[in-house]
Structures are given as C-alpha cells and as structure tokens.
Design a protein with these regions (language model features):
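Active-site microenvironments of hydrolase-like enzyme catalytic domains
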Residues: 91-109
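Gly/Ser/Thr-enriched, mixed-charge loops and adjacent short helices
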Residues: 13, 104-159
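Short gly/pro/ser/thr-enriched loop/turn and capping motifs at secondary-structure boundaries
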Residues: 73-76, 97-100, 113-114, 121-122
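Active-site cofactor/substrate anionic-group-binding motifs, chiefly glycine-
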Residues: 62-72
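Conserved phosphate-binding catalytic cores of ATP/NTP-utilizing and phosphoryl-transfer enzymes
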Residues: 70-87
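Short acidic, glycine/serine/threonine-rich loops at helix termini
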Residues: 15, 51-54, 81, 100-105
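An N-terminal, well-structured beta->alpha segment
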Residues: 1-63, 88, 137-159
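Short, ordered loop/turn segments at secondary-structure junctions
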Residues: 44, 71-72, 94-95, 111, ...
C-alpha cells in the first residue's frame, strides 16, 4: 500500500501534511530512480504553488534542468514533454480539492502518470533520502516561453 501517492499524485495541505521534506525527498528519489535530465513544471493559481515549486527544485541536483512554464492547464503537459523533449513532467495542482490543498503529479516522458510500480519504488526510496547541500542550488528555475509561442503559432495557423 502506498503512503504518499494517491489515485492521482500526492495531495495535502502545504506545510501540514504536504511538507517541504516530503516534496523534496520525492523529487530527490525521482532523480535517483528515473534519472531525468530535463523536467517541465506547470502549476495552478493556488497560493502555495510557487512555494511547492521551490521544494521541488531543492530535491533535484544542479545537474537537472528544471523549466517552469508557469500557470498552464494540466492537459498541456504531454504537449510540453513531446515538443521540448523533457523526460519528466511535474504538475503542481490539487485539481478539484478545496483551495487550501495542493499537490504534485508526476508525468512520464510519454505524457502519462507514473505507473504504480514506479510510485511504490519512489516511496520505498523516500525514507532513505538525505538531501545533500548541493540540492539547494535551483531555487529559481528557468521560465520558458517557447511553449506559449509555439502554441500561439499553431493556434493562428488553425484559424
């Protein structure tokens, strides 16, 4: 049985049952297991989304490129992954949950949520994580507007 992952990612109330330690350890564990080199992040407009973005970045080493695409719908993640060649996506959102909640959903390079077996492996690894100090160097990920420009070009071609 999974401790952190629910049906659709990890959800909770930030700084209560969804903590910096949990989120940073999850991303550090993801790096150990999936070995991503480029991570796309999108978020919703909840007050805690930028704080969770910081926590995510603290879990990844400085070898991982983290691109913050800002506020975009969840359905845009597969397009980002395919268009720009990221091999991991993270959506910061709690979907339909009340506004005090937030969470993270991990998306594989094919645009699908991670398989249960991988989530279980990540969870097993979380308890053994000790974040090295080098993992604090990505406090401000790059913002990338290529997706928005590409989307606008595609949209204009269609009309």
């Amino acid at each position: 049985m999974k401790k952190y992952f629910g049906t659709d990612g990890i959800r909770g109330i930030p700084n209560k049952n969804l903590t910096k330690e949990i989120v940073s350890n999850v991303t550090c564990s993801v790096e150990d297991i999936l070995k991503p080199t480029s991570v796309a992040v999108i978020l919703d407009t909840r007050d805690s989304s930028l704080e969770i973005l910081d926590w995510i970045c603290e879990g990844f080493s400085e070898n991982i490129e983290v691109i913050n695409y800002g506020v975009l719908p969840s359905g845009s993640m597969p397009i980002l992954l395919e268009t720009f060649g990221h091999n991991l996506g993270i959506i910061i959102s709690a979907s339909h949950n009340p506004s005090e909640y937030n969470g993270i959903k991990l998306i594989d390079e094919n645009g699908s949520k991670l398989q249960d077996e991988i989530e279980i492996e990540i969870e097993a690894n979380i308890e053994n994580i000790s974040l090295p100090s080098a993992h604090t160097s990505l406090k401000n990920p790059k913002r990338d507007i290529r997706f928005i420009l590409n989307f606008l070009i595609r949209f204009l071609i269609l009309i």
